[in-house]
């Protein structure tokens, strides 16, 4: 039995999809415990590139059962568009299952998201505008609509009307928008009920029974540690808990059953949207990482902000998630750049901080303290073992490992599934 949770250790886009794709073919279930169609990931299988948003990367596994857990918020239109797109390319999404307790994104959530961001102006968070935050807000406020609700029309209508009693007041009187018609929302949800019904399960029961039978479960977290609503760079965060603890809550798998916590981390750092970013680059090297690393958001099309590796954040992520292992990605992007700076600590108003500053204000004023290491010039994309890497690349990896709080068990040297060096097999260890 193994229950492995995959967590982004930075601000997202670390390569969680690749890690899930590799491990997903070796497990029985792949569950997405949080997020929605606001965070995309790219998976390369057999030379084919798949860009997924709502579905877990495990949907491309030929053997694993992919599950959207209770912590996910689901846009049904986006869900079936993604399924249809995969099947049009020959992929089989028929094994997908969905928790009856997952919440649904309503059209009015997307409207609220966009008008709120517009109202905030320069203070906007930089959301994707897909209604994720408002859906989670309704969940916490106990006025959300769950998957199970669309199979009972009377309950569905009651919940939609109740939600719109308040939201229409806000839209009309505060934002000068038209009121949303409740019946249109009800019919929108009902139109998906028949297609959705065969997919819906008691995910908590299924997953725990699988573990009791000695099967393997992979929890594929969305977003990343530094976007966690509690542990991230608040308020520039997502609306869920994309950390190891959140994976337990969003899947219904108890924390004592989690056997490994695998952090996914780039050999440099990126971020999309607003918020502090101590190692951010504004020179030619930022543009270099952006171009060579292909740093454009799958979901938004926005260019990612790029910076050097930040070991302060890595140590913080290790602590918050209890990482047992790291999966280092995009090492190949650093080939041939001369010298590689590594952030080992921060300077905040003349005081050295080896760990995350206590307050958000201090973090905003943090200046990175760097040490540098020489880069390598050799092409590493065909390396199969750690010993195949140039010595300078080995030294860089080992230094990051020393600084980051957990052992490095996987190293990505290219986008392909087979372009991965395995130092420790987390499944074999469990």
From Swiss-Prot:
Pfam family, any one: Adenylsucc_synt
Cofactor, free-text remark: Binds 1 Mg(2+) ion per subunit.
Compartments where located: Cytoplasm
This enzyme's EC code(s): 6.3.4.4
UniProt-listed InterPro entries: Adenylosuccin_syn_GTP-bd, Adenylosuccin_syn_Lys_AS, Adenylosuccinate_synth_dom1, Adenylosuccinate_synth_dom2, Adenylosuccinate_synth_dom3, Adenylosuccinate_synthetase, P-loop_NTPase
GO BP field: 'de novo' AMP biosynthetic process; IMP metabolic process
Sequence positions that bind substrate: 298-304
UniProt binding sites for IMP: 13-16, 38-41, 128, 142, 223, 238, 302
Pathway(s) where this gene product acts: Purine metabolism; AMP biosynthesis via de novo pathway; AMP from IMP: step 1/2
Cofactor(s) the protein requires to work: Mg(2+)
Name this protein carries in UniProt: Adenylosuccinate synthetase
Enzymatic class: ligase
Annotated residues for binding of Mg(2+): 13, 40
Keyword Magnesium part of the UniProt annotation: yes
Gene coding for it: purA
Positions of the catalytic residues: 13, 41
Organism: Corynebacterium glutamicum (strain ATCC 13032 / DSM 20300 / JCM 1318 / BCRC 11384 / CCUG 27702 / LMG 3730 / NBRC 12168 / NCIMB 10025 / NRRL B-2784 / 534)
């Amino acid at each position: 039995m193994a229950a492995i949770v995959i967590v982004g250790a930075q601000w997202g886009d670390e390569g969680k999809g690749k890690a899930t794709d590799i491990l997903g073919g070796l497990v029985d279930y792949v569950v997405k415990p949080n997020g929605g169609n606001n965070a995309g990931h790219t998976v390369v299988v057999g030379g084919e590139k798949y860009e997924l948003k709502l579905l877990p990367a495990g949907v491309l596994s030929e053997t694993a059962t992919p599950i959207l857990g209770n912590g996910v918020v689901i846009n049904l239109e986006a869900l079936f568009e993604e399924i249809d797109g995969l099947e049009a390319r020959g992929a089989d999404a028929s094994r997908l299952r969905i928790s009856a307790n997952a919440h649904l994104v309503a059209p009015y959530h997307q409207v609220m998201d966009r008008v709120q961001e517009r109202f905030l102006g320069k203070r906007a968070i930089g959301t994707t505008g897909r209604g994720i935050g408002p859906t989670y807000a309704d969940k916490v406020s106990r006025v959300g609509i769950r998957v199970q609700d669309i199979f009972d029309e009377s309950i569905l209508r009651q919940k939609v009307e109740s939600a719109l009693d308040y939201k229409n007041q806000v839209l009309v009187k505060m934002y000068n928008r038209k009121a949303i018609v409740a019946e249109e929302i009800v019919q929108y949800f009902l139109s998906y009920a028949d297609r959705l019904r065969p997919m819906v399960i008691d995910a908590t029961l299924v997953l725990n029974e699988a573990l009791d039978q000695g099967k393997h479960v992979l929890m594929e977290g969305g977003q990343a540690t530094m976007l966690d609503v509690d542990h991230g760079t608040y308020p520039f965060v997502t609306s869920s808990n994309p950390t190891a603890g959140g994976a337990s809550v969003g899947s219904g798998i108890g924390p004592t059953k989690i056997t490994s916590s695998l952090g996914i981390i780039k050999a440099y750092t990126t971020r999309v949207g607003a918020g502090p970013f101590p190692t951010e680059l504004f020179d030619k090297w930022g543009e270099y990482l952006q171009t060579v690393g292909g740093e454009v958001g799958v979901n938004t099309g926005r260019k990612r902000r790029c910076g050097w590796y930040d070991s302060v954040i890595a140590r913080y992520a290790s602590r918050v998630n209890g990482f047992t292992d790291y999966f280092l990605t995009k090492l190949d992007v650093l080939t041939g750049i001369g010298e590689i700076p590594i952030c080992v600590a921060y300077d905040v108003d003349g005081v050295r901080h080896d760990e995350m500053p206590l307050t958000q204000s201090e973090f905003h004023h943090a200046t990175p303290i760097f040490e540098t290491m020489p880069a390598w010039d050799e092409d590493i994309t065909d390396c199969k073992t750690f010993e195949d890497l140039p010595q300078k690349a080995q030294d860089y990896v080992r230094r990051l490992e020393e600084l980051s709080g957990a052992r490095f068990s996987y190293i990505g040297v290219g986008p392909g599934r087979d372009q991965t060096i395995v130092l420790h097999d987390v499944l074999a260890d469990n």
